[in-house]
Structure formats: structure tokens, C-alpha cells
């Protein structure tokens, strides 16, 4: 859920196609580590 929420935050912020790096940056800002496998499933 955290990955979907981060993706949606990036999209609402004006990024029409958020990358994994964008989502990781959002998660890092609140102290959450990103799992690359799960993150890539959300992006693809």
C-alpha cells in the first residue's frame, strides 16, 4: 500500500509518470525503506 500511496502522491504532485527513484525519494523522506521487487511491481 505504501508504494501505491507514494505513486499517487507523485502523480498528484504533477509527475504524470513517476519512476522508482521518485517513489524511493518519497518513502525515504518519511523513513521507510523501499523493497525493489515490490516497487517494480507497482511501476510496471
From Swiss-Prot:
**In which domain of life is the source organism classified?**
Eukaryota
Q: Which UniProt keywords apply?
A: Acetylation, Phosphoprotein, Ribonucleoprotein, Ribosomal protein
Annotated positions of the Phosphoserine modification: 17, 19
Provide the positions where the record notes the PTM N-acetylmethionine: 1
List the InterPro entries. Answer: P1/P2_N_sf (IPR038716), Ribosomal_P2 (IPR044076)
Single biological process term from Gene Ontology: cytoplasmic translational elongation
PTM comment: the record says: Phosphorylated.
Keyword Ribosomal protein present in the record's keywords: the answer is: yes
Modified positions (N6-acetyllysine) in chain numbering: 21
Query: Which sequence positions carry the modification called N6-succinyllysine?
Result: 21
| Cellular component, GO annotation | cytosolic large ribosomal subunit
Q: Write out the GO MF terms.
A: structural constituent of ribosome
General function of this protein: Plays an important role in the elongation step of protein synthesis.
Q: Which family does it belong to?
A: Belongs to the eukaryotic ribosomal protein P1/P2 family.
Q: How does it assemble?
A: Heterodimer with RPLP1 at the lateral ribosomal stalk of the large ribosomal subunit.
Q: What is this protein called?
A: Large ribosomal subunit protein P2
Amino acid at each position: 500500500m505504501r508504494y501505491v500511496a507514494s505513486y499517487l502522491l507523485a502523480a498528484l504532485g504533477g509527475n504524470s509518470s513517476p519512476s522508482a527513484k521518485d517513489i524511493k525519494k518519497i518513502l525515504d523522506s518519511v523513513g521507510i525503506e523501499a523493497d525493489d521487487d515490490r516497487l517494480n511491481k507497482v511501476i510496471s
